[in-house]
């Protein structure tokens, strides 16, 4: 099929534009003009479309005059920041061969640094004619420009002053997952005009709460510009979480209270001043263009066959390892460049401290499957800038062989859903969890202890943005997603939750007390385990989503954090702060080497000893007992050989967990004469003001469903 053309064109004097350069890609101002460069291996012509400042009126179309190494490029002298533009790309419309060029569709520059306006759903957005008997093989000639966000040339200048990366060591890292809108929309100290924006997140009172909590790094859900799905808007909902990116360099316009890119940089500077890192959740596995029936917004119309993974036997259709309709092809060098350029932009220009990669297995896929030696994964480790920031993988996707927990290369940390599921099942009271629970408490060495990887490679979590909040985890057996208007069919049914006896809110004081204790148990397990803990914003004071375990579309009070704390919330917050302080005070809780049970002959101790309630080491039979629910974890910091002496590094700690519903007498290990056990944490007694001192060889009554942390201390008398 021959290339189709745009229905309307404008002739422009060719002398206006110069040849420019093929690099860097995107629209870049050099102080005298703007250079435009766009990759397309299969296009026949590219038109640059200029708009007024509102983006509503197309003023001019200019053909990019040069084509060098698959890059269309041109230079507009006297152009300056604030210029609003888009592209129309000509080429064959042959879906069966993977080509979907349609110059009637205005396209977003994949390298755009800022967008103007928002997407307005219309049939004109689609490259084919909706309702046509040929479906997506038909060709639509309507102009999509009135309905598409436009790109804006920016001036990147910003005075950072003395800002620099906080560079918190992994061993001291505690992640805090939050949503830009959700965290500030209901915060009383945030001005109304700043709520739900980067300026709101930079609020001093909000940052004080985060800093006082004891976390080190804020992990923001996606902030790249994204599209609200049409079916959600029709229901009065929207794509709240933002896992539907359309521009990898541009922040979502709604998050800019000022409308200026500098607002993001100002937020980063405020976070760094507070000693906090910023980690971005990034979605490079797919785009908002969907499958073959989706709209033509950007990459599909620029070079569909290069950007996306297509079915090898019928390139009309997309490989869908993301579960969203399409999958980006990072085996293509220019797609790989797009993603790594985006990462370098956010890390370098915007001073971001790290990234969490959504469905990261996709980013390591060749056509034959996942490889930890994929060019993208290797590039991140070798890049002189990216190797300095934190890299966190969500190590799975929806494709064959997509579950890759523990299989990412050294240099990467990974979300560990094995920790989540095992810890939930253990405190729920499921049988046969004890041995697996012990493995998760030691940073899942069975998964990560290889090739010099460290315990912090395991990112431990009990809850995350997708799923129940911590309060809902102990309050609901089943999901309650009716507000999503999908007949409660969305969201997982495998929650491993326990409502403690009643579904949802109750006035029963016994059940409410048990729920509070269970939340303390979860927090104690998370923050006293080896590895890197992640807390979800609001869990620290018992936030609820009323049983909704899939609030992806709830830009409402369901998805926003309520900062009006009740007494239970305030008490839980104080308890969590105490745990984070203890974690930082005792390096043995955040070791740089795995606990493996090795015996140190020089000092006569093991790095970890697993104790049964009778005080003896766990036997094989006890490990295999499906009814076992009580365990002691004796950690001796002296057994870790490290060239650096750190305060508290040689401490000896005893962690006892009891998931039985009844009290279990536990024989505490004997101690040298003059020493004693000091109880630092007891989830059954959260208001314990002073450490409880326990005498030699004490038989301690460990209450049902509780966690104890004890430290070995010398009597000062």
Which residues does each predicted region cover?
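Core domains of carbohydrate- and sulfate-ester-processing enzymes
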Residues: 89-159, 230-238, 244, 274, ...
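Conserved, mostly hydrophobic/aromatic
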Residues: 38, 87, 178, 220, ...
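Hydrophobic faces of well-ordered beta-strands that scaffold small-molecule active sites
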Residues: 174-176, 218, 278-280, 355, ...
């Amino acid at each position: 099929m021959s290339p189709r053309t745009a229905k309307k064109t404008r002739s422009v004097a060719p002398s206006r534009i110069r040849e420019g350069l093929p690099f860097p890609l995107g629209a870049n101002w050099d102080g005298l003009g703007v250079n435009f460069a766009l990759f397309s291996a299969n296009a026949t012509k590219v038109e640059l479309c200029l708009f007024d400042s509102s983006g509503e009126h197309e003023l001019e179309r200019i053909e990019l005059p040069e084509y060098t190494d698959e890059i269309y490029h041109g230079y507009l002298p006297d152009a300056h920041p604030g210029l609003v533009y888009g592209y129309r790309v000509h080429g064959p419309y042959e879906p069966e061969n993977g080509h979907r060029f349609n110059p009637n569709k205005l396209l977003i520059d994949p390298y755009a640094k800022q967008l103007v306006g928002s997407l307005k759903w219309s049939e004109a957005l689609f490259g084919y004619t909706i309702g046509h008997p040929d479906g997506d093989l038909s060709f639509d000639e309507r102009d999509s420009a009135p309905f598409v966000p436009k790109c804006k040339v920016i001036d990147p200048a910003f005075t950072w002053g003395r800002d620099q990366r906080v560079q918190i060591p992994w061993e001291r890292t505690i992640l805090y997952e939050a949503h830009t809108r959700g965290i500030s929309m209901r915060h009383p100290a945030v001005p109304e005009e700043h709520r739900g924006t980067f300026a709101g997140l930079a609020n001093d009172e909000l940052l004080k709460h985060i800093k006082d909590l004891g976390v080190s790094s804020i992990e923001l859900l996606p902030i790249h510009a994204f599209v609200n799905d049409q079916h959600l808007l029709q229901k009065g909902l929207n794509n709240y979480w933002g896992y539907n990116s359309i521009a990898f360099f541009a922040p979502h316009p709604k998050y800019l209270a000022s409308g200026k890119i500098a607002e993001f940089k100002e937020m980063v500077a405020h976070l760094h001043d507070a000693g906090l890192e910023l980690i971005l959740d990034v979605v490079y596995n797919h785009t908002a263009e969907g499958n073959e029936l989706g709209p033509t917004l950007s990459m599909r119309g620029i070079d569909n066959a290069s950007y996306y993974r297509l079915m090898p036997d019928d390139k009309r259709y997309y490989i869908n390892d993301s579960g969203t309709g399409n999958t980006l092809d990072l085996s293509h060098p220019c797609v790989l460049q797009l993603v790594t350029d985006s990462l370098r932009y956010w890390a370098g220009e915007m001073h971001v401290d790290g990234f969490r990669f959504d469905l990261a297995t996709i980013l390591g896929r060749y056509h034959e499957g996942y490889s930890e030696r994929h060019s993208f994964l290797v590039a991140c480790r070798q890049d002189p800038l990216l190797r300095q920031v934190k890299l966190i993988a969500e190590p799975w996707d929806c494709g064959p062989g997509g579950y890759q927990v523990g299989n990412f290369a050294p240099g990467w940390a990974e979300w560990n859903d094995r920790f989540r599921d095992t810890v939930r099942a253990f405190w729920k009271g499921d049988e046969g969890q004890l041995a697996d629970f012990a493995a998760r408490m030691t940073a899942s060495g069975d998964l990560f202890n290889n090739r010099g990887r460290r315990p912090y490679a395991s990112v431990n979590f009990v809850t995350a943005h997708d799923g129940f909040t911590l309060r809902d985890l102990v309050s609901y057996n089943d999901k309650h997603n009716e507000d999503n208007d999908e007949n409660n069919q969305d969201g997982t049914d495998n929650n491993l939750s326990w409502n403690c006896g009643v579904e949802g809110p109750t006035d029963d004081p016994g059940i409410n007390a048990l729920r509070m204790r269970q939340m303390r148990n979860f927090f104690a397990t998370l923050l006293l385990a080896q590895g890197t803990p992640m807390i979800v914003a609001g869990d620290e004071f018992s936030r609820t989503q009323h049983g909704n375990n899939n609030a992806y579309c709830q830009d409402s009070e369901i998805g926003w954090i309520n900062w009006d704390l009740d007494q239970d919330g305030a008490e839980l917050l104080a308890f969590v702060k105490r745990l984070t302080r203890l974690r930082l005070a005792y390096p043995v809780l955040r070791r740089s080497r795995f606990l493996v049970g090795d015996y140190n002959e020089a000092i006569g101790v093991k790095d970890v000893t697993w104790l049964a309630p009778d005080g003896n080491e766990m036997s094989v039979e006890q490990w295999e007992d499906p009814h076992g629910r009580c365990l002691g974890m004796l950690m001796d910091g002296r057994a870790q050989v490290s060239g650096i002496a750190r305060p508290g590094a040689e401490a000896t700690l005893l962690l006892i967990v009891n998931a039985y519903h009844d009290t279990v007498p536990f024989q505490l290990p004997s101690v040298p004469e003059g020493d004693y056990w000091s109880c630092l944490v007891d989830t059954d007694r959260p208001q314990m003001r002073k450490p409880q001192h326990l005498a030699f060889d004490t038989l301690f009554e460990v209450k049902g469903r509780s966690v104890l942390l004890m430290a070995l201390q010398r009597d000062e008398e």
